[in-house]
Amino acid sequence: MPNKKAARNAYFFFALDMIPELRRRGLQVSGVREAIPLCSEDWALLSADQKEAYAEKARLLKNDPDSTSTYNDGVFGQRKRNATKSSDFSSVGFFQLNDQRNCVTQRTVPAMNIDISFNKNKAPDQHVCYFINIFSHGDMPSLCEQRYVPCEIACVRYSLREGILGSFHDFIDPGELPRGFRYHCQSGSASTHQIPISGFELANSDYHNMFRKLCSFVCPTPCPVVPVYTKANDIYRVDWCLQWLANKAGMENHFRVQEVETLIIKFYQDKLQEEPSRPTVSRLLDVVQWDYSSNTRCKWHEDNDMWCCALASCKKIAYCISKALASVYGVTLTPAHLPNPERSRNQNSVNPKVVVLDAKRFQRVCSSDPKYSTDKSERSSFEPRGVKPYQGPSGGGRGILRLLETLAASQNSSG
């Protein structure tokens, strides 16, 4: 049997360029063979010109089979050699338009995870971070050429010390919907944010101005890498939509979307030298108590009494962090931290929707607080007026066992 090798066609070179991006998404990819079946959706997003650029690489290799330098150097070696050529469209799976000329160029910043570190000149609670979310008219199936249909974007500036410092919000005009998937978009919208898929008067089609305002809001001074945070489950969608918006705007995308769960763990690490588990942090962010709070949703969603809003999702991340970490860092809660800080301060600390992460400190509080005492005399003062405390049976065990013991005792006494 002949030794079959992967055909070095246009798709082969695209899969080669996609390897770093696939690894960034958490996929275990060791080579092109494993990357090939994972790149079909991203390949469908490329324009005809971009696909032609990869086809040209394949033709060059076919004409000169001994020349293997075009792919052996990997993504970054090829990128360095062709940095000045406008015909090089490799972009680690995504592409961007240059702000000065309307032609596709390579991505200037390779996809990578950024180490979360706080400014040494500032306390961690003074660190300013940005929470972002972008909603779509559903998650398009693999048959669709477009992965998402962006419709709403929001970003919140936040510090633990000061609370929410500002917000950015806009509705995105998705343009022409993918042909044949209008019903899919309609269903996705109706089941979540309910933003109209067409004819929406608030939808903004000035992509350049929208993206420029977002960049000015997050990073007024130029910066090669700008970290923004969202929930781990939303990272791929938000990152894809940012790339799409940057392409429409004709600008470079310097945003790097990071997990807000990692940021929260970093806050605990710096203060307590301990870190909660990731599932615990995920549960911390999974709350519904502020869905209908005032000044949380955008005006359109609030006027229409809808809780699923991109701006609200960003603000609720800030609320969760404020409520969990305020006591750890000794921060006084204000209306910039929570919609109703007085109520949050006075409510019972054992809230089923709030996860207590510092278990040792909570146990110390419980042992010293009479509310959690096992002594009935101490606990009776906390019973509602007019209600007698429940005097349970002295016996232990399951109810069925006590019932059997009672029946056996009654039979013995009657016998």
From Swiss-Prot:
| Coiled-coil portions | none
Its function, per the record, reads:
Plays a central role during spermatogenesis by repressing transposable elements and preventing their mobilization, which is essential for the germline integrity. Acts via the piRNA metabolic process, which mediates the repression of transposable elements during meiosis by forming complexes composed of piRNAs and Piwi proteins and governs the methylation and subsequent repression of transposons. Its association with piP-bodies suggests a participation in the secondary piRNAs metabolic process. Required for the localization of germ-cell factors to the meiotic nuage.
Q: Name one Pfam family in it.
A: Maelstrom
Tell me which residues form the DNA-binding region.
4-73
User: Which family does the record assign?
Assistant: Belongs to the maelstrom family.
UniProt-listed InterPro entries: HMG_box_dom, HMG_box_dom_sf, Maelstrom, Protein_maelstrom
| A GO molecular-function descriptor | DNA binding
* Protein name as it appears in the record: Protein maelstrom homolog
* One CC-aspect GO term: cytoplasm
Compartments where located: Cytoplasm; Nucleus
Bias (Basic and acidic residues) occurs at 372-386
